[in-house]
Every structure is written in structure tokens, then in C-alpha cells.
Amino acid sequence: MNNMKILFISLGCDKNLVDSEHMLGLLVEHGFEITDSEEDAEVIVINTCCFIHDAKEESIQNILEMAKYRTAGSCKVLLVTGCMAERYRDEIIEEIPEVDAVLGTNSYDKILDAIQDVLGGDRFQEYADLKGLPKIDAQRVVTTGGHYEYLKIAEGCDKHCTYCIIPKLRGPYRSVPMEELIAEAKTMAEQSVKELVLVAQETTIYGIDLYGKPSLHLLLKELCKIQELYWIRILYCYPEDIYPELVQTMKEEPKVCHYLDLPIQHANDEILRRMGRRTSKQELIDKIDFLRSEMPDITLRTTLITGFPGETKEQHKELLEFINDMEFDRLGVFTYSPEEGTPAAAMEHQIDEEVKLDRQAELMELQQDISAELGERRIGQELLVMIEGKVADEDAYVGRSQADAPGVDGYVFVNTPEARVSGDFVRVKITGALEYDLIGEISQ
């Protein structure tokens, strides 16, 4: 298999990307060459997502598109893994004959075996119990292309929200042992990674299964000891599970970004109850107020679901008022997607798609105004910015501050004729604001 060219298509979330990078590491160690050409690829791997309807459609389209190269191209192995592979294991093999191998979400460490079997003339399927964690010892391949990387600290989820299929596809919550995470982080830091973004289905309760109590604060303290790292960012924090030691560590450790991603989903108590969320509107207000009192400069991001079954005009209006009052720095909105096998999909009073889209647009229009106002308040402030690249044909660079998570938030555009290198940190005085981005110049 030496020098076989492999194309990897990683769909969906950042957690899926981490799995893809681990698989790539194993394959590169065994002589595979990475390519971005469908025509040249001898092995094509699609790491799929099916969290919502649109993600499922994207996965199907990619599989069917790559199947063409399996039929009439260089491709000798077409392999499908990820959440769609776990959920529709039999359908994929039976209905798409071009697919040679299917690996479940907890079986991606068998990718080398799968390729070997297919090259030997067999089709391959592997679905491990959703209990332990896949084990790949090879060095992970960093694919983000910048100076940040994701560190997946746990797999699975125990929440069982009524709209979500993830616990069925990823299994119960399993933390990655701390020593493994530290070793992985050190390796990435040696590859010029300066920002680590901690991800999981939920990061807040990291370690509860291994150490008997939430231990994210202890992990943060260990990661902060890695000299080459500048920023450590936390995504996917459930508000009800944020605990005092975590907040105290964020305050004490300068490398930990004053940034939290809190996926609240809604603010009406009845909707939250039927979603299976373990919090209330007042508890959300109290937690947000607490975080802002402890860290006045904290950036809060959230995600919402609009059009949940039975959501009334009044409940939607309540959500709008809540968002207006809370002034989240960053916000994303999904329209509710009924997922087969979830309690919410069987609920009465499903909302029309047009109504969902209208409500989503209302929320995003409100957030756009909030974001523009918050940006205006930033004018005159000085921020530390990590340069990510140059703006084409202009004396300007694009970067991010601690308030900007990669891939989902805005940018800081830095006007300067001075040459800068990706990964540089510069102090920037903010001189202007767009709806989601800031403009500044290097402080003198």
C-alpha cells in the first residue's frame, strides 16, 4: 500500500475533523500519500455527518459524487465512516454498491484493516460497541492550515435531549485520559499550533467518568504549562454544568481565553422542558450574569433551535426578547430538524418549514443589530490579535482575537503596510466595526 494516494472528505463538526486527522495519521504512517484530487485518489474516505437533515443530504451527495470515481477513475477503495455510517450501516452497503467499506463511529481505528480487506477483494463492515475509545497511536495529521487546532477531550453524550440523535450514534460520555490529551497537545504545539480549541459533545463535565468529578479545570492547568501554546479556547459548555473551579481557573490562567460557547437552544421554560434540557430561563440568566460579573471581558457565544414542535408565536417572541436582553456576542440559529428515532420527531404540532425559516431570519436579524452595536462599542479598544493571513491586493491582514473562535466567528482586519507572518501576535487598536467583524491598525 506504499505511496497509494488517499483523499479524505471530512464533513460536519470539528469533532469529526479530529477523527479524520487521527485516521490520516495512521495511514500516512503506513505510506499513504494525501491528495486533494478526486481523479488521482486510489482511496477515498468520507467521514460523514447526519446531525440534521441538511448534513445528511450533504453526506449522501458526497458519497454519490465519489462513487463516480470508484466506477470510472483511479479509486480502488471507497470507504464511508462517521455518524451516517453508524446510523445507516446496512442501507449504505445495500443501496450503494460502489461503497467498499463502512466503519461505525467507534471503529475508525480499523481503517487500515478495511483498506487491506477491500484490496484483497472483500467488502468490509465494522461497528464496535459505543463504550471504549478508538485507539490510534500514530501522530495526528494537522489539516486546519493555520496555527489553531481542535483537541477532542471526550466522546459521546449522556444528555439525551429529545431532538438529538447523537447519543445513539456516539454512545455514552467517555473522557479521553488526561495524559493522552497532554501528549497530543504537546505534539501539536511542536507543529507550530498556538491555539488549542477544546471540543466534545460537552466539555464542561470532562473527567467525571474517569476521575469521579468534573476535571476540566485540572486539564486546563496542565495544558497551560505547554510553553508553545498561547491560547486555549473552550467550546460546547452546558450552562448548568459550569462550576466554580472552572471559572476560577479561567480567571487565573492567562492562556485560557475569556470565551465560552453555551448552546442554550431556547429560553422558554416549556420548550426547554420538552427539549429535555436541564435548565430554566432564570437559571440561564443567573449563569450568564455570574460569568459576566466574574469575567467582565468574557465573550459568550450561543446556538438556538427555532421551530421546535409546538413553539408558539408567544414563545418565539419570548426568545427574541431574551436574546435582545442578554446581548450574546456571538449567536447561531438552526431550524428544528425532525430526526427519525428521537422523541421530538414524534411530537404533535410540528412547525411548517416556512415558519421556521421566518423565525430563524428574525433571530439572525436581531443578532446582526446586536453584533453591530457591540462592535461599535469596541472602537478605541486595544486587542491582541493572531494574524491568519494577508488580504489579497491590500496592505491589510486578517486575524482573530480571543473573542473569535475559528470557523464560526468573525475576524479582525488589520491595516498595516508592514509585513506580517501567519501566527504572529500583534496588538491592534480598533478603528471601525462591520456587522460581524472589526477593523483596526497596529498599536504604536
Cite the ranges covered by each PLM segment.
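Proteins enriched for Cys/Gly/acidic motifs involved in redox and nucleic-acid/cofactor modification
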Residues: 1-206, 245, 256, 260, ...
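Conserved beta-strand core positions
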Residues: 6, 43-44, 149, 196, ...
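Radical SAM enzyme [4Fe-4S]-AdoMet core and its adjacent flexible, acidic
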Residues: 13, 207-228, 274-278, 338-369
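Conserved SAM/AdoMet-binding glycine-rich loop
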Residues: 78-80, 87, 92, 190-314, ...
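Conserved, mostly hydrophobic/aromatic
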Residues: 181, 198, 234, 262, ...
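Active-site proximal loops enriched in glycine and acidic residues that flank catalytic Cys/His/Asp
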Residues: 200, 236, 264-266, 302-306, ...
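Extended hydrophobic-aromatic, low-complexity segments
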Residues: 258-259, 272-273, 284, 296-299, ...
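Terminal RNA-binding accessory module
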Residues: 346-444
